[in-house]
Amino acid sequence: HTISMQAKKQPMTAFVLQGRAPQLALVVSNKTMKDYKQLSDLKGKKVGVTAPGSSSQMVANFILKKGGLGPKDVAFIGVGSYSGAVSDIRSGQIDALINLDPVITILLKNGDAKLVADTRKVKESESFFGGTMPAGCLYAPVSFIEKNPQTVQALTNAIVRADEWLSKATPEEVAKVVPASYLMGNRDIYLAGFEGNRDALSPDG
């Protein structure tokens, strides 16, 4: 996002890191894409993203390019990142989905979808992007950072403390402190999803 904002002449700077990989995964529906073999099979299909123009769509574009597809070769559909995304692929309203956990883990555990591309692991992410791809972070306009150094430092300190805690916490400890809605009614799925994403979390900001 900081790079795209620069192109719009809105200078932004990221100042502390939460995710060192996008933590997004692309899956295809086992209902509408039973004969899926390769990325090019998605041509003309409906691909669910968290929202149009979101980071999930940007990552999808990178992945699809590996299969020789451009942004106009598929129809991107905004489906959110929770229960709506799960129901849309189960009902066949979309053919593929790029999303986060616990959505991805739910679909894979229940056999609703097949994993096609995974950026929840640093090495796999680097293979798609040709290098590191920092993801979740705090960023702000350069002018705000220059005028509010103490606020920026306080935010940085808080995220670093959270990063350090997450790097050592057990999945069970994490589940105890997140809102109940994040568990999507299945604590075990949430725990599995967190463990699957641990590698992508920055340990130190």
What are these regions (language model features)?
Residues 107:
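Short helix- or helix-capping micro-motifs
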Residues 145-205:
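Secondary-structure end/capping motifs
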Residues 91, 103, 139, 147:
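Conserved, function-defining micro-sites of small-solute handling proteins
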Residues 128-140:
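Active-site-proximal catalytic alpha-helix in oxidoreductases
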Residues 25-27, 137-140, 144-145:
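Short glycine- and hydrophobic/aromatic-rich loop-to-beta-strand nucleating segment
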Residues 87-89, 126-129, 149:
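Short, well-ordered secondary-structure micro-motifs
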Residues 34, 38, 120-131, 198-205:
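Short, solvent-exposed loop/beta-turn-alpha elements that line the ligand-binding surface or hinge
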Residues 1-81, 85-101, 112, 116-119, ...:
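Short, glycine-/small- and polar/acidic-enriched structural segments
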